[in-house]
């Protein structure tokens, strides 16, 4: 019996690596995409069960031609996990234009490149699922996230749009908007991060939620609920509390 195939961008680190291992443990074939050959090899060494089901591909998500070449070689995906991204905290009082552009190129355009490359086979199969990794910083602006947050807001909006187009094609779209997760990215933050979650726990929650019939999911529950409520409050009140509790 053929295995279900998942495409995971940003597979070699953080949530991507943790989710890769969970899917392989549950019998999936994973096409892991990362720009780092070294990290992909390190990840493969940590996979103890069904190691042969991990198929690493070195590719920068900015390279649409190479992504399309990979798409031609691999099995039709049942899941496209659009996860690759970067995070650099910025002081928005400084000149950050190169950082802003880099975040847009990787976090937004990179996701679109992967989407465009791997969607056609899924459409032919008229069955599948797409999970887009956004963030609570896509709900409202957070300290130090002037480069990162807008790209995640764009991804959330993108997911909201494509779900209508793809529903009739048999493709389920979800957006995952986690709070703070322990990764190499969040280790760059110099402020208190409420509800900071272990990356393996986060990946387990993604696996659990991908089976549910809901568009957007976030975790941990209490802090994500807190942030959701604050995104609905008057700006004066929400910005005051964020300054007191996060910055």
Regions found by a protein language model. Give the residues of each.
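Conserved glycine-rich Rossmann-like NAD(P)H-binding loop of the short-chain dehydrogenase/reductase
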Residues: 26-42
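Conserved glycine-rich cofactor-binding loop
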Residues: 12-13
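Conserved NAD(P)H cofactor-binding loop of Rossmann-fold oxidoreductase domains
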Residues: 83-89
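C-terminal helical subdomain
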Residues: 175, 191-225
């Amino acid at each position: 019996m053929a295995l279900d195939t998942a495409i995971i961008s940003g597979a070699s680190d953080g949530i991507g690596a943790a989710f890769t291992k969970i899917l392989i443990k549950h019998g999936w074939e994973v096409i892991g995409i990362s720009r780092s050959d070294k990290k992909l090899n390190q990840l493969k060494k940590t996979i103890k069960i069904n190691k042969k089901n991990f198929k690493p591909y070195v590719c920068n998500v900015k390279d649409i031609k190479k992504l399309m070449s990979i798409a031609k070689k691999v099995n039709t995906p049942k899941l496209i996990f659009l996860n690759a991204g970067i995070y650099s905290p910025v002081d928005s009082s400084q000149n950050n234009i190169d950082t802003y552009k880099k975040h847009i190129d990787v976090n937004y355009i990179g996701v679109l490149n992967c989407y465009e490359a791997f969607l056609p086979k899924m459409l032919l199969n008229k069955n599948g699922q797409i999970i887009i990794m956004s963030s609570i910083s896509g709900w409202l602006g957070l300290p130090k996230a002037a480069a990162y947050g807008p790209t995640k807001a764009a991804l959330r909006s993108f997911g909201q749009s494509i779900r209508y187009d793809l529903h009739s094609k048999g493709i389920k779209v979800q957006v995952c908007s986690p709070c703070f997760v322990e990764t190499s990215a969040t280790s760059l933050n110099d402020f208190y991060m409420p509800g900071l979650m272990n990356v393996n726990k986060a990946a387990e929650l993604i696996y659990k939620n991908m089976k549910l019939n809901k568009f957007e999911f976030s975790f941990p529950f209490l802090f994500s609920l807190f942030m959701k409520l604050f995104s609905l409050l008057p700006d004066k009140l929400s910005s005051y509390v964020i300054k007191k509790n996060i910055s």
